[in-house]
Design a protein with these regions (language model features):
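N-terminal chloroplast transit peptides
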Residues: 1-2
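Class I SAM-dependent methyltransferase Rossmann-like catalytic core
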Residues: 24-111
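C-terminal lobe and adjacent flexible extensions of AdoMet/dcAdoMet transferase-like proteins
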Residues: 30, 104, 265, 285-380
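Class I SAM-dependent methyltransferase SAM/SAH-binding core
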Residues: 101-187, 201-205
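Short catalytic micro-motifs in class I SAM-dependent methyltransferases
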Residues: 192-195
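A short glycine-rich, Lys/Arg-flanked "PGG" loop and its adjoining helix->strand segment in the class I
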Residues: 201-216
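Conserved catalytic/acceptor-binding region of the Class I
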Residues: 218-286, 294-305
């Protein structure tokens, strides 16, 4: 990707627009600030040496990520029309539920919330259905089509569980350059929205900066063991037919990285946990269709543009042979059905506040372990 192409992608993904708001100054939304930061970065990248360094650190094609989100919005809209009584995507809905379970375990109010990318339809819908404390939600996404889809599902007059109207704004923006005021929201929630950014520590730091003191950052991303079956099948097929291996699945973070990411974002009381979800599909092609509907197909800059037919057929055969979906009595498991693993990494952190628990300074203890042992021995 040339420098000019990179600049165009950055500007496009940083431009933001809001729906239903005519106020010149918003207490939460900061579109102008995002545009100014985009212009400043574009100016810096006129330095060819710096631009080359930045390009070398890029992993994902953000223009393609946006295109995938546009397509996912269309496919989810079509799925919702076909099954209006169901969620647009059952897996995204379930993973949104699991993420929000962590929010519901916290006994405090979150009046202003940013919903950032990923499964934003499921998160927004569930927040409204299950909470009574929300006053304002800002939905941020790289794709305007996805924002339009979420708005069509939520409706023109959103209300929370107790019937109170909730103000919702839909803002197109980049996760790496959030159009949100600093120190303005009580929580940032991102369900599967951050594993497609090129600067994950920077994106998390940007999100953390929008939180008020003692505000909550709650996120889930797909982990490195996601789609391990697909990786193996493609690697074996390429090795057999082409004598080498290419990146067929986008690179993802591992659980060991998450604690460090929370620390680099200056978030306190970090917590990380993992879920493994195994899904069954009628065929490898059905898996790929589902990945497209979620917006989760490969957007890596180093991806191959296509897979030769011979290799693709071999990969399909190997996948079905090595990773068949277990047959469930009474089900309609078809021959050739396969399973796929989704590893979900959950990250929780808090904006620092004096009321939070913190470790004592080294050397501040007033009782030694030896004295404590003597005391305990004396009680026996």
């Amino acid at each position: 990707m040339g420098c000019s192409a990179f600049d165009r992608g950055f500007h496009a993904s940083s431009e933001a627009s809001t729906s239903g708001s005519t106020e010149p100054k918003d207490a939460v939304i900061d579109v102008q600030g995002a545009k100014e930061r985009a212009r400043a970065r574009a100016t810096m990248l006129k330095d060819k040496a710096l631009a080359a360094q930045v390009r070398a650190m890029m992993v994902f094609d953000r223009d393609l990520v946006r295109a995938h989100r546009d397509r996912a919005a269309f496919l989810q809209q079509r799925a919702l029309k076909a099954r209006p009584e169901h969620a647009p995507d059952d897996l995204l809905d379930e993973l949104a539920r699991r993420l929000l379970d962590r929010l519901f375990d916290i006994k405090r109010d979150f009046k202003r919330i940013v919903v950032l990318g990923g499964a934003n339809e499921a998160i927004t819908r569930r927040l409204l259905a299950e909470r009574d404390d929300i006053e304002k939600i800002v939905v941020v996404d790289l794709s305007q089509d996805m924002l339009d889809f979420v708005e069509s599902v939520i409706g023109a007059e959103p209300k929370r569980r107790d019937g109170t109207p909730v103000e919702i704004s839909y803002v197109q923006g980049d996760e790496e350059n959030l159009p949100i005021q600093m120190n303005s929201v009580d929580a940032v929630i991102s369900c599967l929205g951050l594993h497609w950014v090129n600067d994950l520590p920077g994106a998390m730091s940007s999100a953390a900066a929008t939180l008020v003191p003692d505000g909550l950052f709650l996120s889930s991303i797909f982990g490195g063991n996601t789609l391990q079956e697909l990786r193996v099948a493609c690697a074996l097929a390429e090795t057999e037919h082409e004598g080498g291996v290419s990146a067929r699945v986008s690179p993802l973070a591992h659980v060991r990285d998450c604690g460090s990411l929370l620390g680099r974002a200056n978030l306190s009381l970090p917590a990380v946990d993992v879920d493994i979800v195994t899904m069954g599909y009628g065929s490898p092609e059905k898996l790929v269709e589902h990945l497209r509907a979620m917006g989760e197909t490969n957007a890596g800059l180093m991806r191959r543009p296509f897979l030769p037919r011979e290799t693709a057929v071999a990969a399909r055969t190997l996948y079905a042979e090595k990773f068949p979906a277990p047959h469930t009595p009474g089900s309609d498991n078809a021959e050739g059905a396969v399973e796929a693993t989704f590893e979900v990494l959950y990250m929780t952190g808090w904006r620092s506040h004096e009321s939070q628990q913190s470790a004592k300074q080294r050397g501040s203890a007033t009782v030694s372990l030896a004295d404590l042992q003597k005391h305990l021995d004396g009680e026996k």
